[in-house]
Structure formats: structure tokens, C-alpha cells
């Protein structure tokens, strides 16, 4: 069974036992989180599509850890103007593990 969930403004395809990084959540490591914004649930040929979300469906997850991604460099240069800026950014994330998908 798989599901397409929405969290942090992004969509993810998840299955039971999968670990993935999502945008930072306000939950301690080791706690259980229920995600209820389920866009689609599928199992073989049987597919339920929400409008916009599937009624009564939820995905149970466990928060594994919090962390920060690799640094990206934002470099802007204006040619012939002797002007340039360099800035770094590290995005916070939460690593979750999908425990169960309930239709």
C-alpha cells in the first residue's frame, strides 16, 4: 500500500517502513505524528483519489531525528559593476519513518 501525502508545502509518495526528510516539524524525536493531508491512497489496482484530500485517511509516522541539510551557496554577481554577494544557507529538516497507512 502506498500514499501520496502533503506536508510542508511539498508532496511525497510514501510506503510503510520508508524514512524520508520533510520540512521541520514541531515534534520531539521519538514521538508519533499523524499526517492527515492524504491526496491519494493506492493498493494494486484499487486507488482512492481525494478532492482535495481522502476522507478519514491518515498516515502514522515516528519522528526519527532533526537535522540540517548541506550548505548551498547563493552567489550573485553584477557584471561590469564591481558588485557581488555571497551567502550560504542550510535548511532544517525532520526525518520521519512511516509506520502505518490507514484508509
Swiss-Prot record:
One of its GO terms (cellular component) is cytoplasm. GO terms for biological process: translation. One of its GO terms (molecular function) is structural constituent of ribosome. Keywords: Ribonucleoprotein, Ribosomal protein, RNA-binding, rRNA-binding. It holds the Pfam family Ribosomal_L21p. Coiled coil: none annotated. InterPro entries: bL21-like, bL21-like_sf, Ribosomal_bL21, Ribosomal_bL21_CS. It comes from the Bacteria. This protein binds to 23S rRNA in the presence of protein L20. Part of the 50S ribosomal subunit. Contacts protein L20. Belongs to the bacterial ribosomal protein bL21 family. This is Large ribosomal subunit protein bL21. It comes from Maridesulfovibrio salexigens (strain ATCC 14822 / DSM 2638 / NCIMB 8403 / VKM B-1763) (Desulfovibrio salexigens). The lineage of its organism: Bacteria, Pseudomonadati, Thermodesulfobacteriota, Desulfovibrionia, Desulfovibrionales. The gene is rplU.
Amino acid at each position: 500500500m502506498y500514499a501520496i501525502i502533503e506536508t510542508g508545502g511539498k508532496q511525497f509518495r510514501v510506503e510503510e517502513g520508508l524514512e524520508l526528510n520533510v520540512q521541520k516539524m514541531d515534534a520531539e524525536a521519538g514521538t508519533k505524528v499523524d499526517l492527515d493531508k492524504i491526496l491519494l491512497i493506492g493498493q494494486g489496482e484499487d486507488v482512492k483519489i481525494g478532492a482535495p484530500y481522502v476522507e478519514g485517511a491518515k498516515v502514522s509516522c515516528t519522528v526519527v531525528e532533526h537535522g540540517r541539510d548541506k550548505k548551498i551557496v547563493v552567489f550573485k554577481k553584477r557584471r561590469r559593476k564591481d558588485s557581488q554577494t555571497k551567502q550560504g544557507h542550510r535548511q532544517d529538516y525532520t526525518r520521519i519513518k512511516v509506520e502505518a497507512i490507514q484508509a
